[in-house]
């Protein structure tokens, strides 16, 4: 009997992944279904407009691989349009601040999305179930609308000032210019319509992942962004591909930790573990105050190095001929 776990911040998304496994899907099928479901249930941190990387362990082959689908800057982006103004950005990451935060929100902040290409590559390599079946839960849930609970209100309220700047964002996430909130009644349910997202997911399910980069979806995305003043083009979308990478192998206390390489958190994790291995002796029991202090010092030191030194080489990732634009 197969015993498996699916972890997600959203309980419903985890259930979708578990349902895919119960239907005979590979763990990668569950990842794909979970990814697109999260884009509906938690659109503030997930979705087809983002990017990332995944570390996969294939037990039968005893092989670890990384699928890299990090975002890339549009080819027409001009660095001079993003002057630094001093201080730290207002974003979660303390990068150097850019004038008007134009790298954080608005049409000028939009890179070439990688999530769909990443799921496409994972599906091509390992999936058992049809693409459209894995997207069906996200289509259904988008049709139900975004459930407004305290977490929804908190997340939207934290970005409401920026959402109000852009009509499309305000229409999707605000009610009369204000964040939505749940009603006081214990049985009352408030939902935000997600009709446009449902139509997008249905198109993506029916037409396949390349439609996002080369078809009707690609043209719609590029047209909307360019009309708003952004640089993303259909050419940028058509050129995007996810890539298979060798994992970063991090030796740690006699074992090996596998992580994502290059412009991800993997190198920072490697530096953190390297510092810890030197600064902290293995504990006989649980971590104590000395251990927690060592964790904090190693993380802070590694992150300072990340902010100071990590980035593209001459504006391009050193990946060979495929590197056609700076990565994000």
Set out the residue ranges of the language-model regions.
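Stable alpha-helical structural segments in soluble proteins, enriched in small hydrophobic residues
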Residues: 34, 118, 122, 275, ...
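Flexible, polar/acidic helix-loop-strand segments at domain edges
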Residues: 267
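Internal maturation/activation junctions in enzymes
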Residues: 168, 176-178, 278-328
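Short helix-capping/linker segments at secondary-structure and domain boundaries
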Residues: 124-129, 206-209, 276-283, 307-310
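Noncatalytic scaffold domains of N-terminal-nucleophile
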Residues: 1-15, 19, 27-207, 212-214, ...
């Amino acid at each position: 009997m197969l015993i498996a776990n699916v972890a997600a911040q959203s309980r419903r998304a985890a259930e979708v992944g578990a349902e895919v496994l119960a239907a005979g899907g590979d763990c990668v099928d569950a990842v794909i279904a979970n990814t697109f479901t999260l884009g509906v249930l938690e659109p503030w941190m997930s979705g087809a407009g983002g990017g990332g990387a995944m570390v996969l362990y294939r037990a039968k082959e005893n092989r670890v691989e990384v699928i890299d689908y990090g975002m890339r800057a549009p080819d027409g982006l001009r660095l001079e349009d993003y002057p630094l103004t001093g201080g730290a950005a207002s974003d979660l990451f303390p990068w150097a601040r850019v004038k008007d935060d134009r790298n954080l929100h608005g049409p000028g902040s939009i890179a070439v999305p990688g999530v769909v290409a990443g799921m496409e590559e994972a599906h091509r390599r390992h999936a058992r179930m049809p693409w459209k079946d894995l997207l069906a839960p996200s289509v259904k849930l988008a049709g139900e609308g975004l459930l407004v609970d305290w977490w929804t209100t908190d997340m939207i309220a934290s970005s409401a000032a920026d959402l109000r700047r852009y009509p499309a964002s305000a229409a999707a996430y605000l009610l009369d210019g204000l964040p939505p909130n749940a009603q006081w009644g214990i049985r009352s349910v408030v939902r935000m319509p997600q009709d446009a997202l449902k139509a997008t997911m249905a198109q993506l399910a029916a037409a396949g992942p390349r439609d996002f980069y080369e078809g009707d979806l690609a043209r719609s995305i590029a047209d909307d962004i360019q009309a708003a003043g952004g640089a993303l083009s259909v050419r940028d979308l058509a050129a995007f591909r996810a890539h298979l990478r060798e994992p970063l192998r991090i030796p740690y206390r006699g074992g090996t930790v596998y992580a994502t390489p290059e412009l991800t958190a993997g190198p920072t994790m490697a530096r953190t573990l390297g510092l810890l291995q030197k600064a902290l002796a293995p504990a006989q029991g649980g971590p104590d105050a000395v251990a927690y202090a060592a964790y904090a010092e190693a993380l802070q030191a590694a992150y300072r190095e990340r902010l100071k030194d990590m980035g593209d080489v001459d504006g391009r990732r050193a990946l060979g001929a495929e590197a056609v634009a700076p990565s994000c």
